[in-house]
């Protein structure tokens, strides 16, 4: 058995409390979080979580194939705009 299988997945306490509260009420509303390092666990399935990408919160709907991944994997932090077309400065 590997070391990581012995450890419990990390989920921020405030995020876990919000999800448990919504599950008890059987409500679906957007949960705002800055915790990109939290692991997606099965009780999160069906909820929409707004994950902070450094500038804004991106709403992500949690599906069953996302379980085990981190929240930050689904909110990209960089926007690649492509290389400049006429950039010949490095060709000297």
Swiss-Prot record:
Pfam families: Ribosomal_S19
Localisation per UniProt entry: Plastid
Predominant subcellular localization, coarse grouping: plastid
GO BP terms, alphabetized: ribosomal small subunit assembly; translation
Gene3D superfamilies attached to this UniProt entry: 30s Ribosomal Protein S19, Chain A (3.30.860.10)
Family matches, as InterPro entries: Ribosomal_uS19, Ribosomal_uS19_bac-type, Ribosomal_uS19_CS, Ribosomal_uS19_SF
GO cellular component annotations of the record: mitochondrial small ribosomal subunit; plastid
GO MF annotations in UniProt: rRNA binding; structural constituent of ribosome
Keywords of the record: Plastid, Ribonucleoprotein, Ribosomal protein, RNA-binding, rRNA-binding
HAMAP family attached to this UniProt entry: Ribosomal_uS19
Similarity annotation: Belongs to the universal ribosomal protein uS19 family.
Role, per record: Protein S19 forms a complex with S13 that binds strongly to the 16S ribosomal RNA.
PANTHER family: RIBOSOMAL PROTEIN S19P FAMILY MEMBER (PTHR11880), SMALL RIBOSOMAL SUBUNIT PROTEIN US19M (PTHR11880:SF8)
Protein name, entry field: Small ribosomal subunit protein uS19c
């Amino acid at each position: 058995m590997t070391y990581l299988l012995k450890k419990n997945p990390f989920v921020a306490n405030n995020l876990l409390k919000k999800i448990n509260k919504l599950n008890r009420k059987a409500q679906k509303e957007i949960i705002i979080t800055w915790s990109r390092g939290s692991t997606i666990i099965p009780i999160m399935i069906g909820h929409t979580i707004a994950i902070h990408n450094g500038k804004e919160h991106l709403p992500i709907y949690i599906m069953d194939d996302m379980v085990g991944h981190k929240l930050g994997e689904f909110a990209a932090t960089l926007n690649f705009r492509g290389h400049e077309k006429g950039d010949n400065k490095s060709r000297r």
